[in-house]
Amino acid sequence: MDDDIAALVVDNGSGMCKAGFAGDDAPRAVFPSIVGRPRHQGVMVGMGQKDSYVGDEAQSKRGILTLKYPIEHGIVTNWDDMEKIWHHTFYNELRVAPEEHPVLLTEAPLNPEANREKMTQIMFETFNTPAMYVAIQAVLSLYASGRTTGIVMDSGDGVTHTVPIYEGYALPHAILRLDLAGRDLTDYLMKILTERGYSFTTTAEREIVRDIKEKLCYVALDFEQEMAIAASSSSLEKSYELPDGQVITIGNERFRCPEALFQPSFLGMESCGIHETTFNSIMKCDVDIRKDLYANTVLSGGTTMYPGIANRMQKEITALAPSTMKIKIIAPPERKYSVWIGGSILASLSTFQQMWISKQEYDESGPSIVHRKCF
């Protein structure tokens, strides 16, 4: 497809926005889903200070800004800021006119219906797109892995969900959602670093902790054993240099932080861990298809990027499943972007072209058309 008429694929995550052109093998723009507003009064006249900053620019000026994420737990909570992010995506990052391209957006399953209606309305009424579609994130990840059957455990910054898919059909009754993801782990790491005497409190400092988490954390295969090793030696300790040059040391926090994915009680949550959620999701499916799901468990999203997570999932699900069951955890190296990649594949299929919601259909039916045309 040519760039001039190619569909735009925008995966609006709670933490990062991934955007690009259908048919490409990777997103062209990846930036934080952040809108920042100055905390202080501007005193330098004529500097052209803006009243808000989006994405990387907000991130780089974070020291003087209050940072807000308009998407929480996969649901848009601030539509004005969301519009700013889309505007930034089209005009600054991709440099396209949205009224000239069909737009494929993504959404977490089990989102409130009003969320996708409002997305549809903004695309057609604010950005005047000729056509649009809203796809379920996990389904796109399965496309990207080249499968039509499997269970996707997709964990991003705001929401984790398990979606069983059989021969291309998502099984809605068996989809489970867990509001525990990367942002909660960042907050938890902030908390346990405070116990070590390092204080991180502001929205800007939270971003530093997120970086520590992404660079140094890993999932232990055996948590108790790892705790014992950490207590008896300093072999697991790593140091991290803060932006001001101060160096901090982190030890068992490296694996205690992502352990919360398997033991949500660490965060004071009563829900099941990601391994049990995946298992429960499989158990909600017909007995005849479970075998295929166990053998095709696909990890997707940035929060599945911790070293050791696939081995741990394999171990935990093996312990829950029938003893003779073959279990295979698939963790593609590009899984951070597999939702976007799946969207790029889907939007460039010739068979998909009749699936778009056109401006004409929208004008006839209004925003509720999205429930009829998009799963």
UniProtKB/Swiss-Prot annotation:
Disulfides per UniProt: none
Tell me the residues on which N-acetylmethionine occurs.
Answer: M1
Q: Which GO terms describe its cellular component?
A: actin cytoskeleton; cytoskeleton; dense body; focal adhesion; nucleus; plasma membrane; protein-containing complex
Residues annotated with Methionine (R)-sulfoxide modification: M44, M47
* Membrane spanning stretches: none
InterPro entries listed in its UniProt record: Actin (IPR004000), Actin/actin-like_CS (IPR020902), Actin_CS (IPR004001), ATPase_NBD (IPR043129)
Q: Where in the cell is it found?
A: Cytoplasm, Cytoskeleton; Nucleus
Main localisation: cytoplasm
What catalytic reaction does the record list?
ATP + H2O = ADP + phosphate + H(+)
GO MF, one term, reads: ATP binding
| Entry EC number(s) | 3.6.4.-
Keyword terms of this UniProt record: Acetylation, ATP-binding, Cytoplasm, Cytoskeleton, Hydrolase, Methylation, Nucleotide-binding, Nucleus, Oxidation, Ubl conjugation
Family named by the database record: Belongs to the actin family.
Q: How does it assemble?
A: Polymerization of globular actin (G-actin) leads to a structural filament (F-actin) in the form of a two-stranded helix. Each actin can bind to 4 others. Identified in a IGF2BP1-dependent mRNP granule complex containing untranslated mRNAs. Component of the BAF complex, which includes at least actin (ACTB), ARID1A, ARID1B/BAF250, SMARCA2, SMARCA4/BRG1, ACTL6A/BAF53, ACTL6B/BAF53B, SMARCE1/BAF57 SMARCC1/BAF155, SMARCC2/BAF170, SMARCB1/SNF5/INI1, and one or more of SMARCD1/BAF60A, SMARCD2/BAF60B, or SMARCD3/BAF60C. In muscle cells, the BAF complex also contains DPF3.
Recorded hits in PANTHER family, A to Z, give: ACTIN
Miscellaneous note of the record: In vertebrates 3 main groups of actin isoforms, alpha, beta and gamma have been identified. The alpha actins are found in muscle tissues and are a major constituent of the contractile apparatus. The beta and gamma actins coexist in most cell types as components of the cytoskeleton and as mediators of internal cell motility.
Q: What is this protein called?
A: Actin, cytoplasmic 1
